[in-house]
Amino acid sequence: KNEALEFSLQAGEKIGFVFPIYSWAPPEIVLNFIRQLSLKGYKRQYLFFVCSCGDDTGLTQQVLEKALSHKGWKCHAGFSVTMPNNYVLLPGFDVDNKELEEKKLADAVSTVSKINASISKREELFLCHEGSMPFIKTRIINPLFNRFQMSPKHFYATDACIGCKRCEESCPVENVTVVDGRPVWGMDCTSCPVSYTHLTLPTILRV
């Protein structure tokens, strides 16, 4: 939403941003949220971020720290949690096999526990798995992704659609509306796979 947001902070309060990685960077919706956010009573309180990724984060830490510094805020810590891949909207991308999926989920439990401990202690550290070629992924591929993939124009519903409205209810930006039993996409799309992954049958596809 394009509107100002204000939060009042207490002296010892922690500030946290939790988000998924989109093409090796924070989603534009998260960066826009930071631009619109006002923290009343900010006095360098402990600020951290936790991001989830399928494999690696690229230069997410750099991108987020720059966005926060533009607001006059210092980022004290950042962490990544590797989760099962769920991006299936481009050729060559698919979900992980069952064995890898279960391993990632099991490892994530331990990772989150360690992150919680670090945040509780207000530790100042960054544990983000950048992966290989982070500059290319974040500085070259990500802008192309934001320019050409952040669109709903290729989505369509198959004949298996029963008008259950799960896509409408799960859309994080309220961009999907079910009309006459069929989903209709607006233009405020973040190109996330939530509508696809929330369905029990593959009724929403992308060409």
Could you say what each language-model-derived stretch is?
Residues 140-192:
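Ferredoxin-like iron-sulfur electron-transfer modules
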Residues 197-203:
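Conserved small/polar residues in nucleotide/adenosyl-binding loops
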Residues 1, 6-19, 23-144:
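FMN-binding flavodoxin-like domain, especially the glycine-rich phosphate-binding loop
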Residues 24, 157-158, 197:
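Intrinsically disordered, low-complexity regions enriched in small/polar residues
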